[in-house]
Amino acid sequence: MEMMVQKQRHEEGEEERGGLCAREIKELDFFSAAGAGAGRRDDDDVLRADGISSSHAGFMVSTALDLLTAVNDGDHHEEKKGQSNIHQSKQMDAAATTVEGELRQAGEENRRLRRRLEELTSSYGALYHQLVQAQQLHTKHQQQAPIAGVQLLDALAAASPASHRRRAAAAVDGDRTADSDGGEGDENVSPSLGSKRPAAAATLTRLTPESGSGGENNGGGEQAPAAEMAPCRKARVSVRARSEAPMISDGCQWRKYGQKMAKGNPCPRAYYRCTMASQCPVRKQVQRCAEDKSILITTYEGTHSHPLPPAAAAMAKTTSAAAAMLLSGPAVSRDALFAAHHHVVAPPPFFHHPYAGSTMATLSASAPFPTITLDLTQPPPTTTTTAAAAMLQLHRPYAFSSLPFSMYGAGGGSHRPPVVLPPPSSVVETMTAAITRDPNFTTAVAAALSSIMAGGGAQARTPPRGGSDAAGDINGGGGADHATAGARAAAAATQPCGTSPT
């Protein structure tokens, strides 16, 4: 349709230029598609048939499709280049596949090595833990080895067969018979002084609570069960003295390094360190008594590592001896530690202390460490009976303070019921009550004291602080014979009420 419009316009232009050639005017139906198509075909046919002029030939459009291309050298080169590119890409793909396989193998090897490393690390940790436990156990055994040895010796002593005790009793009976025979020949010799030191030791062995109360029940070779032991590796010595000064003068130089309020006591507790040597480990605590403000309580801990001046030797020896009493020898039984107060035997250096005649040594279970208390506030003994009771208390405290005297045996084949004493305030009161109840015991003690006074009067010295002669003998004036006499007096205490000590 557009072609026809252009053609018509072209014809009109030519007519305007001069109308040189007349054209046939044809009617065209623009509203009929079929007519338009037919007219277009007719026009094309007419143009082809009539041979349109050269001006019209310029408008011919070639609609042929040249699908066949000629092959030349350039195209062949491009084809070879494409094939080489394809070959190179295939080679690169193969190389990439090979590298990928190698990486996969390396990853597997890495995972295997990692698992092996984890296993080795776990094994090393387990072995190291076992090594640490073994070292701790070895150290613990080394620390407990000395205590275990002491406990073993004490257990063997506590669990000694009944036959040993019977042999000791037989030795004591034989010694008593010999004493009786010797007394008939020489009336001036006291029966109490005729015994030997081994007999006194056997008598004291017989006075133990285990042999006195359970010896008959453990007959037939049975062993008494050993008391449960509680090792004492560290001890403190507490000294109670009346003083208005901030602290008692013990001859050492101290430096205060702390102070705090103690529970249940309004008075503060001061802490001191010995400054007489740079490495001295001795410490002490000073505090007023809550019940009596005039009493000053000084607690010592440790042993001096330097020479002491003469003024400090007395107190240092006293505290060292009291601490050594807990740390040396058999371990303290746990039953004794749980008791409120138990009187203990002081070692020989403690006997020579000026306050030994009036000192009451007690063990305390309320302190975190085993503590022995030396009470210097007690008045010294003033009578012969009290001195003898104190001597017997020092020789065997447990036998006389925990068991009645009638429980150690029965005389004449008859068994007397045990006499239950009321709880006394001290061992001295216990001894006084026992003396008033047993006339034979009173006779034996009187004989022993008279022998001591007659035999050691020349060597007796006046005890400090108003002590008696008997107390002075105990503190070091009487010698070995006086100690043996005290042991014989203790042996006489174990005799039944119906028999004679000789």
UniProtKB/Swiss-Prot annotation:
Residues 243-309 bind DNA. One of its GO terms (molecular function) is protein homodimerization activity. One of its GO terms (cellular component) is nucleus. Residues 197-211, 481-493 have a biased composition (Low complexity). Highly expressed in leaf blades and leaf sheaths. Expressed in roots, culms and panicles. It comes from the Eukaryota. It is found in: Nucleus. Gene3D superfamilies: WRKY domain (2.20.25.80). Induction: Induced in leaves during natural senescence and dark-induced senescence. Down-regulated by abscisic acid (ABA) and jasmonate (MeJA). Down-regulated by salt, mannitol-induced osmotic stress and drought stress. PROSITE patterns: WRKY. InterPro entries: WRKY_dom, WRKY_dom_sf, WRKY_plant. Residues 212-222 have a biased composition (Gly residues). GO terms for biological process: abscisic acid-activated signaling pathway; abscisic acid-activated signaling pathway involved in stomatal movement; positive regulation of leaf senescence; regulation of DNA-templated transcription. Pfam families: WRKY. Residues 75-95, 166-231, 456-502 are annotated as: Disordered. Residues 96-123 form a coiled coil. Forms homodimers. Transcription factor that acts as a positive regulator of leaf senescence. Is involved in both the onset and progression of leaf senescence. Upregulates the expression of genes controlling chlorophyll degradation and leaf senescence. Acts as a positive regulator of the senescence-associated NAC genes NAC4 and NAC58. Acts as a positive regulator of abscisic acid (ABA) biosynthesis during leaf senescence. Acts as a negative regulator of drought tolerance by inhibiting ABA-induced stomatal closure during drought stress. Belongs to the WRKY group II family. The gain-of-function mutant plants oswrky5-D (T-DNA activation tagging) promote leaf senescence under natural and dark-induced senescence conditions. Overexpression of WRKY5 reduces grain yield under normal and drought stress conditions. This is Transcription factor WRKY5. It comes from Oryza sativa subsp. japonica (Rice).
